[in-house]
């Protein structure tokens, strides 16, 4: 029996055995709770739901040059994303490891031995000195294989492939999360810049008010008590102190942005800007599309599939394991003519093992695998429910904040007008400085609240994009 015939025999046997059965339950995605429409959008229905998903680089809708520059860097340089990428690569390698178990392990063994002792020489002639030297060599090809009769290896491949897809979705979710965090932090920095601008304008306005109070007292136009000047002075000093403190938050936002794009804070300089991001319109689509658009939902669903395959692996332990092995090659002593046909040697064998009694271990393993699957189902459904709640929160937040912003715009306009009137009346001597101070505090408070609402609306818009899955869909998952 030569090596070629041996390999042909093994390949034929392997092909026959690969058609074995597949034990364990086949995977079917369980239904997930999905409402017909969002509660916060009761009167809206998309004619083409897929067209409602954000497309491509969603951050460009905010029209902020800093976002346009930095967002693409997240997928390349962010270390959290990098960590998840390597986890995904590891999972892909595990799929290859599992798939390799379907095939025989083939090796080669070579040995050369020289031994001596009483007896004959290597040529079979009696040694004259009573000692002999024998030279021998062996060259063999070996193969061993455990055929996947019951589908244990195929279930392992299925499990690892699902884990790899789950890790791929987790990578997409990590990338999206870091991009959303970057957009949120950039918005916070832009609002910090706006608060600094407001603080500078407030300081200048309070300086003017102090000069007016001082001038009123000096000119004797009206009875200006020292307390009026002190009140104006304190307001100015407080505004100056607040302005200085605003730099702390801005610096922290800039440092956080640097880390998100994989840079040291000292390597990223973000200049002050008066421009603010534009609030985009984010179409929510219909709830059913959310199941395909959120990578965390896809990751949870793939985890379910992996746990289902694990049940099959546990069930396969009930069945016997058959192993095949063989070797073919040459063996000769002495060394001359090792590869001659007369020196051929071969062996082939099979073994089987089956656990007869294990005190319930295999049954417990199956029960544990089934429980893990049911836990994965619950986790999947919980992820879906939380996803819908996230979107509803974003939609309600945007709606309520829009109403609040509209009401506050009127209040800010009236507050500015009120400060102007109070100053004019103070200069005319009809009111004291307390009226001016109160008007200025109201104006500043309303303007700060206005910026806070603007920030909340922008952050909610970013959050809605993230909670809708960005521009991702489960069609982007690869088959490992």
Predicted regions and their residues:
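Short terminal targeting/anchoring segments
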Residues: 430-452
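Amphipathic alpha-helical coiled-coil segments
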Residues: 81-84, 91, 160, 167, ...
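A glycine-biased, small/acidic residue-tolerant capping/turn segment at secondary-structure junctions
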Residues: 272, 413-438, 462-479
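Terminal intrinsically disordered/low-complexity segments used for targeting and assembly
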Residues: 2-76, 123, 161, 247-292, ...
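Periplasmic alpha-helical coiled-coil/stalk elements that build and connect Gram-negative outer-membrane
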Residues: 153, 169-286, 397, 401, ...
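Small/polar-residue-enriched beta-strand and adjacent coil segments characteristic
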Residues: 23-26, 57, 63-73, 82-85, ...
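Regular, well-ordered alpha-helical segments
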Residues: 93, 100, 111, 169, ...
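Alpha-helical heptad-repeat coiled-coil segments that mediate oligomerization/polymerization in large
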Residues: 225, 387, 391-394, 429-433
């Amino acid at each position: 029996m030569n090596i070629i015939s041996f390999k042909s025999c093994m390949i034929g046997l392997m092909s026959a055995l690969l058609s074995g059965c597949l034990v364990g339950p086949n995977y079917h995605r369980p239904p997930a709770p999905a409402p017909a429409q969002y509660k916060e959008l009761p009167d809206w229905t998309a004619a083409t739901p897929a067209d409602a998903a954000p497309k491509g680089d969603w951050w460009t809708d905010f029209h902020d040059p800093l976002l346009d520059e930095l967002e693409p860097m997240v997928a390349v340089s962010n270390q959290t994303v990098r960590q998840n990428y390597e986890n995904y690569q590891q999972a892909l390698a595990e799929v290859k490891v599992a798939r390799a178990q379907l095939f025989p392990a083939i090796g080669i063994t070579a040995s050369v031995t020289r031994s001596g002792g009483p007896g004959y020489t290597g040529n079979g002639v009696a040694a004259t000195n009573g000692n002999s030297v024998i030279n021998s060599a062996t060259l063999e090809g070996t193969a061993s294989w455990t055929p996947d009769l019951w589908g244990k290896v195929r279930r392992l491949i299925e499990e690892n492939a699902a884990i790899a897809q789950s890790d791929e979705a987790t990578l997409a979710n990590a990338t999206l999360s870091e991009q959303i965090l970057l957009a949120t932090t950039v918005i916070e920095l832009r609002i910090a810049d706006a608060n600094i601008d407001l603080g500078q304008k407030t300081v200048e306005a309070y300086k003017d008010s102090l000069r007016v109070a001082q001038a009123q007292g000096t000119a004797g136009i009206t009875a200006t008590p020292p307390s009026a000047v002190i009140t104006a002075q304190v307001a100015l000093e407080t505004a100056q102190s607040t302005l200085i403190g605003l730099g702390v938050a801005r610096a922290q936002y800039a440092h956080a942005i640097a880390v998100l794009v994989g840079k040291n804070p000292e390597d990223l300089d973000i200049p002050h800007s008066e421009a603010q991001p534009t609030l985009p319109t984010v179409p929510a689509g219909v709830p059913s599309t959310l199941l395909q658009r959120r990578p965390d939902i896809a990751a949870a669903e793939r985890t379910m599939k992996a746990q289902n395959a694990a049940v099959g692996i546990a069930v396969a332990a009930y069945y016997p394991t058959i192993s095949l092995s063989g070797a073919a090659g040459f063996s000769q002593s002495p060394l001359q003519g090792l590869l001659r046909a007369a020196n051929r040697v071969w062996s082939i064998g099979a073994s089987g093992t089956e656990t007869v009694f294990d005190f319930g271990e295999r049954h417990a393993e199956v029960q544990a695998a089934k429980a893990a699957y049911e836990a994965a189902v619950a986790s999947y459904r919980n992820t879906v429910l939380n996803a819908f709640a996230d979107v509803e929160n974003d939609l309600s937040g945007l709606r309520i904040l829009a109403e609040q912003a509209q009401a506050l715009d009127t209040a800010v306009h009236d507050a500015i007008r009120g400060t102007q009137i109070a100053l004019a009346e103070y200069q005319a001597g009809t009111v004291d400085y307390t009226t001016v101070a109160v008007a200025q505090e109201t104006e500043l408070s309303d303007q700060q609240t206005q910026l806070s609402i603007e920030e909340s609306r922008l952050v909610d818009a970013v959050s809605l994009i993230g909670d809708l899955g960005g521009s991702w869909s489960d069609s982007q998952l690869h088959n490992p």
